[in-house]
Amino acid sequence: LNVDVGELRTLGDVERFVGMEERVVKSGTGGSCRERIEDFLVMEKPSESTYIPLTMVGRCPGCGDYHRGKRCPRCGSTLSKSKLYPSYGGKGGHTLFVLEKYDWDTWKAVRRIGRELRRRDKAFGIAGMKDKRAVTSQRVTVRGVPPEALRRIDVKDIVVTPLGRVRRKLRPGDLWGNRFVITVRDADVDALETAIHVIKDLGGVPNFFGVQRFGSRRPVTHVVGKYVVKEDWERAIYEFLTMEFPRESEEAIRARRWLRENWGDFEGALEVFPRFLDYEREILEHLARYPNDYVNAFRRLPYWIRRMFVHAYQSYLFNRILSERMRRGLPLGEPVEGDIVRNGLPTIPLPGFRTELADGEPGDIERSVLEEEGVEPSDFEIRSMPEISAGGDRKPALLRVHRLSAEVIADDVYVVTFSLPRGGYATSFLRELMGPEGVYAD
């Protein structure tokens, strides 16, 4: 973690900062997959053989692009659109519906629907979050609302289609995974065939946690998480408040720089920190009253944010261990002596106080990374804030990529279609196919 953030000039630099140091595809296609919202389509897969179709967009049979509306704005062709998911009657206290959204955060879209229905967050259930800067489809349940009421919802860039009644609420993880249809522009299409071949030959891609896990605009969560795990609360708060990144606003950068140069003047910092940095101001308000009470200042953050810091540091350690495994040439899809295996795949630890480390060379890698970081599994039992302690887990080294295909639709444009099981990051696949630049949305 001893990196000068001023050196993080490219997304490749940022990837290395969060532990993603290796790739299996040495020369990707380049390009961008975020030029248009319609370039990134995500469809939930309840099972391996089914997916929730998107009706908000259709494909032009002429140019191959995806658009909203009925006709292609470029060539005038009638767009080919999917049919609605079939509805059914059913019984139960929850109504299952399809949510399609265009450039909406998942929970903001659900809350907007909740306002229309006069229902709070806890009435809704979802199986998983979907990308914001994308067109997405997924199932949602809502308690105590008849299907007819859902048909009356009219919100810009949201389509709601009731399916029927069910007995239980959808819960996180109630899905097989997601299907992706992604258009990559300004690409070197000559490199596409080789990149696809490498990924298919491996059976997937390294199962890294992508940059968005750490904060795409300000990837500071794992840095804070390290000091949370070490229970160095002043250092954790110092990094959270003062660590600046070039993709932040000038106002935020100036405030962080001022506090770094005037550490301890928390009343003065409240005059400098802008109102939109509300979590930072919560901490500063506490420290202005109780200057050395860092642990309770940190408690001013919501529980889920405090947990997020610990999870981010676990993810960073996972990425570093996976990178070192690749650097040493150990296989990702086949176990070697000493590996801890799940579903036939070698696993990498998300370290925690209950974590079992591997033996042999895989275990040597795991222990050496923890030693370099100066942490032990027992450190994740956080005695001064036990509610954010982490028992740990293990996760496969390889992310299986299913139903992978690609089609070149112009001299520098291609469409790639693939499915990932739940927990898999599309960015992990795309950074291999394309390289890091152009993968992450602003």
Describe each model-derived feature in a short phrase.
Residues L1-H94, K101-W107, R112, E116-T417, ...:
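Extended, charged/glycine-rich binding lobes that contact polyanionic ligands
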